[in-house]
Amino acid sequence: MSHSAIKSERIGNVLCITVDDGRANAFSTSLLVALSQELAEAEADSEIGSVVLAGNQKAFFAGFDLDVINSGDPKAITEMTTAGGAFIRQVYGASVPVVAASTGHAVAAGALLLCGCDYRVGVD
């Protein structure tokens, strides 16, 4: 599954995943599922030695999508938060090191993602 906000680039044995939704990189269900798939594919590739996860120039990640939360739709909210928890656990337990290139603010679930990564680098 691809997502328009995700750009993946392989540099040697490192997979660089950059997310830029043009705003604050809020976690939507579709973004989380696509990120999970990107990481799973990297883990399955024996030539990938590590993954770097970066945001845009404004934010690393801003947490869950407030539009979904404010919608009051319990199914959509549950799907999004479940996908978020699953992705953070996947990052934490990944078979390859995951480096967070924190390009800006990491808010709420975005901060939890930082904690799940093996290494965190603040990028100015």
Which role does the model predict for each range below?
Residues 12, 55-57, 64, 111, ...:
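Short, small-residue-rich loop/turn micro-motifs
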Residues 31-35, 80-83, 113:
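Hydrophobic alpha-helical membrane-association signature
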Residues 17, 53, 65, 113-115:
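Hydrophobic/aromatic residues within transmembrane alpha-helices
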Residues 47, 54-90, 106:
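Glycine- (often His-adjacent) and acidic-residue-rich active-site loop
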Residues 26, 61, 109:
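Residues that form or flank phosphate/diphosphate-binding pockets in enzymes
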Residues 87-124:
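Glycine-rich beta-to-alpha active-site loop
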Residues 1-54, 89:
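Conserved CoA-thioester-binding segment of acyl-CoA-metabolizing enzymes
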